[in-house]
């Protein structure tokens, strides 16, 4: 199998090199890409081109590729090896010969529009991924964060999560349909991003506008506690010893059952921002307390109220 993977932007009529045109005109080649990619390149394909739309889940497309062991041309967005399908195809077809013709990826295009030093950015992809990579960039106090979005983790849901957990100290720079006729670049506060309209595909940069301290080993007195019961929490010495005993920096999931103030959950998340933290508490009053503490200390976590057995 021979794979040619071609990166394109949202430019209405992509300009291809003579080398790429040779691949498009080769005998027996089959084409694949997203529906949007087909709209952009259709006029440059042979009249009888065989095209497969790439959709999620990828299993049917990958099976079709296995059944045709000839030449494939796959279109992708930007740089196919930058969190793109090129990595998937190389993994799934290790014996195939592969050549890649990239263009600027969306984060590069947006950085050029904004004159941002993107080489210093912490890069996060939320495209079909969980929140933990963004959590880590925020907890680690990164000054510039580059984010690839999708139709679920949108600019507004990203802004909502950041505000919920106390990260209001960033400005959002948003790029939509970069490289095309509908291109739009905007600067938004996180509050503005909550209700703004967005065109897909988009990507964004988060630029820090104020620093916040990185907290680990938080004094007990700084936590909000149950009214009238200030001592009802796991004390700092016990928290830190327990988390060390659990080797929390090398774990992926934590269930904190009986979270109360959320002190264990919060310390764990700040020690290991990639940790998927779930806090369970039956007391109704703890809902607001855990939320306030998580926001104060910048610890993104999932809270489950009510009886643990039914959570």
Which residues does each PLM region occupy?
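A contiguous loop/helix-start segment that scaffolds small-molecule binding in enzyme catalytic cores
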Residues: 2-5, 17-19, 56, 70-72, ...
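Phosphate-coordination loops involved in phosphoryl transfer and adenosine-cofactor binding
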Residues: 142, 251, 274
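Conserved Rossmann-like nucleotide-cofactor binding loop
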Residues: 260, 285-286
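Conserved SAM-binding loop of SAM-dependent methyltransferases across substrates and taxa
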Residues: 261-273
